[in-house]
Amino acid sequence: MPVVQVSVWAGMSEENKKKVVEGITRVLEELGIPREAVTVIIYEAPKTNWATGGQLHSEKYANR
């Protein structure tokens, strides 16, 4: 069934990853999809490999 791919900055805590996975699973379950059928894959990328509007996130969000 559904495979949800989530991209985040590197360094997200395991606790927050669990919250993301549970939240996504819960929403799909509300749509009638069995929990067992939901797959969530979290991809981590360093801010130096991520850009928006031509600006690297390592510069744009240097303080985060």
Protein language model annotation of sequence segments:
Residues 2-64:
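A domain-level signal for the structural core that forms small-molecule/cofactor-binding pockets
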